[in-house]
Amino acid sequence: ALGCDLILASDAASMSPPIQRGVVPESGGTWLLPRLIGWHKACEVAMLGEKLRADDLLRLGLVNRVVPAEEFPDALREWAAQLARQAPLAMRATKRTMRLGLDTTFDANAHHVMAEFYGLTRTKDFAEGVAAFVEKREPQYEGR
């Protein structure tokens, strides 16, 4: 789950570090965890092996939001609907430039951002976004 862009958790969620099973964090866990929460907290989570409850995961920044278990399906649908309303090309470019920014300098990332920005201004979605803003209505993006 650490590799997900957004993580919604129910208040019944928990995580047990892999060290409790005699293995290392797999699926990029050893690469991601220190980048997400810092070296010392990552060592605490990965090495002490304490079970983390939903509120612990939220406090550490490993999940975006915790909702009551009975509200989880509705909250998940709302997030999906909110994401679906966004401009898909801009969503892809945002994710790409944010990921690049993790491993590049500020100047290199700024170059990538401006290239993406320029490319997006030539799309139908950009024109739709501007028109919707001017007309004070919700945009209807097509991913073009």
Regions found by a protein language model. Give the residues of each.
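Helical "substrate-binding/catalytic lid" subdomain
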Residues: 85, 105-106
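Residue-level signature of transmembrane alpha-helical cores of multipass secondary-active transporters
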Residues: 78, 115-116
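Helix-loop "lid/cap" segments that line or gate small-molecule binding pockets
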Residues: 45-46, 97, 101, 116-121
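A short structural micro-motif
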Residues: 100-101, 136-140
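Glycine- (often His-adjacent) and acidic-residue-rich active-site loop
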Residues: 21, 104-105
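Crotonase-fold acyl-CoA enzyme core
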Residues: 2-91, 122-123, 128-131, 137, ...
